Regions:
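Glycine/threonine-rich phosphate-binding loop and adjacent beta-strand/alpha-helix elements that clamp
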Residues: 2-27, 31-39, 44-50, 55, ...
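Active-site-proximal cap/loop segments of hydrolase catalytic domains
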Residues: 49-348, 352-355
Length: 597
């Protein structure tokens, strides 16, 4: 339940199923002067939210048309603030900011939003910006309009708020087509922003609005069930409640947390929140942070979209400092200039894939290394076999069968392997193991792949300009959800089906495959790779997000290794682009002989 708010249910037909959709009452949008008069105990049910249809000057040469009404195909009206150059003689493209976070978050408490964007230097974002969105005071002087939208069910916009999915995507389609027809617009619309504003781009682009010129999803999930509400099958409802707690509207919000409790397995409701990537054909500039929960979706989205013109940049930093970093804003401008203004600025020479290879702390081994694809074609998958006799990993499966276990409430087990030569791991890892739950019928597993120095000291990577430690690549699994989806799984990326629960019988030992999110990191000779298995999430307590899982653990977790229970960590070893025997030859298809010769 969303912070104890009143709920109601609306039946809906989805994918041939009748789904009882749970909605929660939102905070009530209230004009500031009325909000201030409310008794303190009533204020918690309201949110100061002005409605004021006017046009005003934001800065020299830039105006804002505030609370503009935009009709959707079903008659529901959405409201938006349109920031644009004041000169109507020059038509400009528009950047759409689409999320439920409110179109004017800085109006009542101007410093509140800035507190939610750590890592971004003070003064970097203007008060015109919507949370996680393009800043109008940067983009409008550069010849763009920025539209901050209160999407369906948010603020004074009509209807129930649907979090992602078909309804939200259709609204995005309608809004883009309305925008393109405005007299100040050049007929091209794009989208920008991180997190929720990136997720919405996948869904809206899949609807193929004719005037959507390109997209720039800056870290966005591809599957709300597998990547947010039930990663690995382990419920994580508190974060969703945290992220939507401030939503305000007149009707109600799609309560994903309540739906995860009501429908804990994959069904049509959750499938509606997975975009059809095969229908995304517009140019796309996608970013992925190696250490953030949007990672899986960002990479999968880039891999699966049908766009012939698509770029991926994978980096170490968190989404907010990366999005507002000046160089990255200028690079995004070059991308938008190319596809929204037809400026031939050489964008096509940008490498299709750029990868930052992490080392330790804030030190990257390589930054923006150009590649042609992801996963890399020169990947060699190797297996490091777990051996519980000495808690090491070996190149061969141990002949002796041994077990190791821990109390899931307090303990964990570590398996180590020390590299004898510099080794880069870039791509997908997976853990294949044999698990037993003693004294219970299920196990929630939290797997982390760490790096240790030559002296055995753990070496995390750091985010937010070196202030927040992150241990490394991770994966999760509720063992009763171990069954794989054969259509989605590959040899390097096991994906659970989540269609049924397979509880464990007493004494039953089962094989499991844990999907580990992609990464890129270097281990120097003498450094150790550690795979840690635990029954709880182990991370620095000062981490920014309240990532809390509803675990189902009891008794003892036992893992069997060796002999008939071969268990291993599969790693993506990256071979050098050129070995010692490489002889350079010109690729005539890529570089044909010039006619002058």
């Amino acid at each position: 339940m969303l912070f104890g708010r009143e709920q109601f249910t609306v039946p809906a037909e989805m994918g041939g199923e009748v789904i009882d959709k749970v909605y929660a009452k939102e905070l009530i949008p209230t004009p500031i002067e009325e909000y201030e008069k409310l008794p303190e105990d009533e204020k918690k049910l309201h949110k100061p939210y002005p409605f004021d249809q006017r046009t005003y000057e934001v800065m020299p040469g830039v105006i804002c048309e505030q609370d503009v009404a935009v009709p959707m195909r079903d008659g529901v009206v959405l409201y938006a603030d349109i920031f644009r150059p004041a000169d109507d003689t020059v038509k400009v493209p528009a950047i759409l900011a689409w999320s439920n976070y409110g179109k004017r978050p800085n109006e009542y408490r101007p410093d509140e939003l800035k507190a939610y964007t750590p890592g971004v230097p003070a003064g970097s974002i203007s008060n015109s910006a919507k949370f996680e969105a393009a800043d109008p005071e940067f983009w409008c002087p550069n010849g763009y309009a920025v539209i901050n939208v209160d999407i369906r069910g948010i603020g004074y916009s009509g209807g129930y708020h649907e979090q992602f999915g078909k309804q939200d995507a259709e609204d995005g389609y309608d809004f883009i087509e309305w925008t393109a027809a405005q007299p100040w617009c050049n007929g091209r619309v794009t989208m920008a922003g991180s997190s929720a504003l990136a997720i919405s781009q996948w869904h809206i682009a899949a609807e193929q609005p004719p005037h959507l010129a390109c997209i720039a999803p800056w870290e966005g999930m591809s599957d709300m069930y597998r990547e947010s509400l039930s990663e690995g099958g382990i419920p994580c409802i508190k974060f969703t409640n945290f992220a939507t707690a401030g939503a305000c509207g007149l009707e109600g919000i799609d309560d994903m947390g309540a739906m995860a409790e009501k429908y804990p397995l994959m069904n049509a409701y959750w499938e509606d929140k997975i975009p059809d990537f095969s229908k995304i054909t517009v140019p796309a500039y996608v970013t992925a942070g190696w250490n953030h929960f949007h990672l899986r979706g960002s990479v999968i989205g880039w891999r699966k979209i049908a766009s012939k013109q698509k770029w991926l940049r994978a980096h170490r930093e968190f989404e907010w400092p990366d999005f507002y970093e000046r160089h990255n804003m200028e690079e995004l401008k070059a991308f938008f200039d190319r596809y929204c203004k037809d400026i031939r600025n050489g964008w096509e020479s940008t490498p299709r894939v750029r990868i930052s290879v992490q080392d330790r702390f804030d030190d990257d081994f390589r930054v923006d290394r150009p590649e042609d694809e992801f996963p890399l074609a020169r990947t060699r998958y190797e297996k490091l076999y777990l051996d519980a006799s000495d808690m090491r990993m070996k190149r061969e499966n141990p002949e002796q069968a041994v077990e190791a276990g821990y109390d899931p409430a307090t303990g964990e087990i570590d398996f180590d392997y020390t590299f004898t030569e510099d080794t880069e791991l870039t791509g997908y890892m997976k853990l294949h193991a044999w698990a037993e739950a003693r004294g219970h019928d299920d196990m929630d597993l939290f797997v982390t792949v760490k790096k240790l120095s030559r002296t055995g000291v753990e070496q995390p990577v750091t985010l937010f300009h070196g202030t927040a430690p992150h241990p490394g690549a991770w994966g999760k699994l509720r063992v009763s959800h171990r069954e794989l989806d054969p259509e989605l799984s590959t040899d390097f990326e096991p994906v659970q089906a989540h269609r049924r629960e397979l509880k464990l019988a007493p004494g039953e030992i089962v094989p499991i495959d844990v999907e580990i999110n992609p990464t890129s990191r270097i281990w120097h000779a003498g450094e150790t790779i550690r795979v840690q298995i635990a029954g709880r999430y182990i991370r620095d307590p000062h981490w920014i997000e309240p990532l809390m899982w509803e675990t189902d653990n009891a008794g003892k977790h036992v893992f069997h290794t060796g002999a008939d229970h071969a268990s291993f960590l599969q790693i993506p070893v990256i071979l050098p682009k050129y070995d010692d025997d490489y002889v350079f030859e010109v690729d005539e298809e890529k570089h044909p002989t010039h006619p002058i010769f």
